[in-house]
Amino acid sequence: MVIRLNSQNLIFMLTTENNLPTPKIFPILNLYVHLLDDYKHWLLVRLDRGIGTHVVTLNAEMTIMAEENADLGKAVKAADLVVPDGSGIILYMRLRGVKHQRCPGIELAESLIATAGQTETINSLCFFGGTPETAVQAVRAWQQQYPNLNILSQDGYISQEEEIEWKKTLSQKQPQIIFVGIGVPRQELWIEENRHLCPNSIWVGVGGSFDIWAGNKDRAPMWLRNNNLEWSYRLYQEPWRWRRMLSLPKFLWRSLLA
């Protein structure tokens, strides 16, 4: 692997395998994000070539959490694709003269599912996470839109014995795209530990996306999303998150000082 610095010493260029498009890398505190014009296309090319991919959707909260949780930091750095999910990440880059489009993880996941529903080349997906009812409802909602979708599902409330059987199922079924929604940092650590079970698949941590797909919760109105205030709507829906939201001013302070 070859690393080169550009003139600003900010964006690193990495060679990629099999002549895939070369992603730029931008450092975010002790982590980094990959900068691509079309994340979905890049992922689908890798999937077509049988190259497994762990996708992390990075936001300010996860960045600060990774500083306090060495295992999470290691998992993020080991990921094949880290996308700028949060508005704080975009602000961090803009403060350093780099403009890039935000890539919300839920929208990336939805675009992958929609593509699978419209093509015969992706014939198997997997949802892992949520309550038993949520897992079923999320699958049902997507299959109502795309009846040909083949979705393997498992809720996130499983015992150790059930998890062993679930891993065996994954190994046997080999779903092509696996969405894991069991919360940060658990989902990133779980993917890093178990991605060898389906080595040619795309693995994506999707947080609470299953609740939204199942209709249990709503995404923020578009005007909040467009003004980088989606976090405030999540806090409104889940006031218990206020302690976790304390990482946002900490990230902003670090952004100004770094």
Stretch-by-stretch model annotation:
Residues 156-159, 201-237:
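Short, flexible loop segments at boundaries between secondary-structure elements
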Residues 174-179, 184:
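Proline-aspartate-enriched helix->loop->beta-strand connector
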Residues 52, 122, 198-201:
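A short helix->loop->beta-strand "cap" motif at the edges of active sites that frequently abuts
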Residues 59-63, 182-187, 209:
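Short glycine-rich anion-binding loops that position phosphate/pyrophosphate groups of nucleotides
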Residues 90-169, 173-174:
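Conserved beta-alpha
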Residues 90-94, 219-258:
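A transmembrane-helix-recognition feature enriched in membrane-embedded lipid enzymes
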